[in-house]
Every structure is written in structure tokens, then in C-alpha cells.
Amino acid sequence: MPVGSVKTLTLGSHGDTMVPVPSASSVDGKPLTEVLSEAEIEPLVTRTRNGGGEVVALLKTGSAYYAPSAAAARMARAVAEDTGQVMPVCAWVDGEYGIAGVYLGVEAEIGAGGVKKIVERDLTESELAGLREAAGAVRAKQADVASL
């Protein structure tokens, strides 16, 4: 299957509390949940959370910098050209998804000046719970740093 026919979304933080969003994913324009069963999706969610380590292991030297570099280039273009493109970014969350006071990976409209607005999706209960768990993990890390 061509990579370009698969569209996915991941929110939250990086690592164990990463939140792959199957409800916002598609294959050839069809919702992922219509293409694969829950039993087929769950291992993909787990592999996505652990994917950074897999990429680093395959590269043997260096790190998993290709995707972040491509994303940074897309963001820079969106800011420079004031496109208003919606993309996943790390942004200050202030009430969206019932979460406030933390930087978190969410979808946002990007243009001149950076984040214009956070775009909230309708998440499933488990996706929303995962996003809230990610926010808690980020807050805990912030508290660790603040205590230094």
C-alpha cells in the first residue's frame, strides 16, 4: 500500500503517553475503523508509541530526525506564507479538550505569528483519556524540572 494513501494523527506527548488517533486516521480516504478491526488497530497503536526507538535501532547511528525535520519545514512554510494550514504541533492548551496550563501535541491552524487557534477534534473516550493522561505526564515532568 502506498504510504501516501494512509493519513494518521498522533496527539499528546512523545513516548509512552503518545496518543495515536485511529478515529482521525484513514486509508485511501476511508476511515481506518472501517478498514481494520479493533484487534488489528491496537497493535498499530502500540507500534506507533514505540516507533521512535524502532527507527533509531534501524539507523544504528544518528537518531529519528527525518520526520521532525520535515514537520519543522512544513511549519516554517505555514508561518512564512501565512497559510492557515492545520497540522499537529506542540501548543499551549488553555481549556481545549478540558485541559489547561500545559504545552501539548494538538492540531492547530498555523500562520504568520505561529499558532492561530487550536483545532479540537471529536475524540473517542479512550483517545480523550489518553490525551488527558499525556497532559498529566507533561505536568509531572514540568514539576520535576521546576524542583531542580
Residue ranges: model-predicted function:
Residues M1-L148:
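C-terminal substrate-binding/catalytic lobe of Rossmann-fold NAD(P)-dependent dehydrogenases
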